């Protein structure tokens, strides 16, 4: 397959997407994200990959869902890069770990624990999963300027959702629980499932990537008997992502002059 041909999984070709791409996990969120674009057009959907393209500040931008977990997210990034994308902003949901992380807060990742295996196909375990600094700074600034309670720090990435939420069912429950205790003691902010893979794949490809998350809930606060509502409205994190993307577009234009 030639890199500029129709991509095997996302079914897109060169010209279908912009250089800037937002990466939610849920295909159902793509249309609502695209409504923040000017003149959004549905490019297509195959498997978990739902793709829309439009414009922000006159710049061509896209949104492509990745599904759940590292393998499908890595495929999306590789195929989007094949047809011209070079800046990726993941927006999704997470569960809080640190006790000060509340539902409806926004978390911006400064690094990701590689408690998954997709990234090992791209870099040895000694290599850190870290986002692009400029993308991360734009996400942090956008969250704060929009008035969201924005946390910045390390997130944990996993392959098994139920390994976190029902570890006692696993034959290796003791390992899962010990690791979880380590994450807590190390001040990890939240848990999700894609960023470690995306950060390492981005490094391997030489592209930019950053992540921000909407906090759904915090199981550690619940265990501690603290106030713990649940929040599934991701619109805040999406707005943060859109504003961060505008900042990046403006910054890139200024550097190009």
Language-model segments: which ranges?
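Metabolite-binding pocket within alpha/beta catalytic cores that recognizes anionic/polar moieties
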Residues: 1-138
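Glycine-rich beta-alpha junction loops
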Residues: 27, 95, 156-162, 197, ...
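Flexible, glycine/charged-enriched surface loops at secondary-structure junctions
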Residues: 40-44, 147-154, 250-257
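Short acidic/polar active-site loop segments enriched in Thr and Asp
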Residues: 86-87, 189, 208
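Active-site rim beta-loop-alpha module in soluble metabolic enzymes
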Residues: 130-187
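Generic non-transmembrane alpha-helical segments
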Residues: 138-146, 201, 240-251
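Zn-dependent metallopeptidase/amidohydrolase metal-coordination segment
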Residues: 196-230
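His/Asp/Glu-rich mid-to-C-terminal helical/loop segments that flank catalytic regions of hydrolases
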Residues: 219-257
């Amino acid at each position: 397959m030639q890199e500029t041909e129709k991509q095997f999984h996302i079914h897109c070709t060169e010209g279908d997407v912009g250089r800037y791409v937002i990466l939610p996990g849920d295909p159902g969120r793509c249309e609502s994200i695209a409504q923040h674009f000017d003149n959004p057009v549905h490019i297509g959907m195959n498997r978990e990959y739902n793709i829309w393209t439009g414009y922000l500040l006159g710049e061509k931008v896209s949104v492509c869902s990745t599904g759940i977990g590292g393998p499908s997210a890595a495929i999306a990034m590789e195929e989007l890069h094949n047809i011209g994308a070079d800046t990726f902003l993941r927006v999704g949901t997470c569960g809080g770990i640190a006790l000060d992380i509340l539902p409806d807060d926004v978390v911006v990742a400064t690094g990701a624990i590689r408690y998954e295996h997709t990234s090992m196909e791209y870099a040895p375990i000694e290599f850190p999963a870290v986002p692009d600094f400029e993308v991360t700074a734009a996400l942090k600034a956008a969250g704060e300027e929009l008035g969201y309670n924005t946390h910045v720090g390390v997130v944990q990435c996993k392959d098994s959702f139920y390994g976190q939420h029902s570890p006692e069912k696993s034959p290796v429950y003791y390992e899962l629980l010990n690791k979880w205790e380590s994450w807590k003691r190390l001040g990890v902010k939240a848990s999700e499932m894609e960023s470690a893979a995306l950060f390492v794949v981005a490094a391997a490809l030489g592209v930019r990537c950053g992540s921000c998350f909407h906090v759904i809930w915090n199981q550690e606060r619940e265990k501690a008997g603290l106030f713990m509502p649940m929040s599934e409205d991701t619109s805040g994190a999406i707005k943060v992502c859109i504003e961060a993307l505008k900042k990046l577009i403006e910054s890139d234009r200024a550097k190009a002059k």
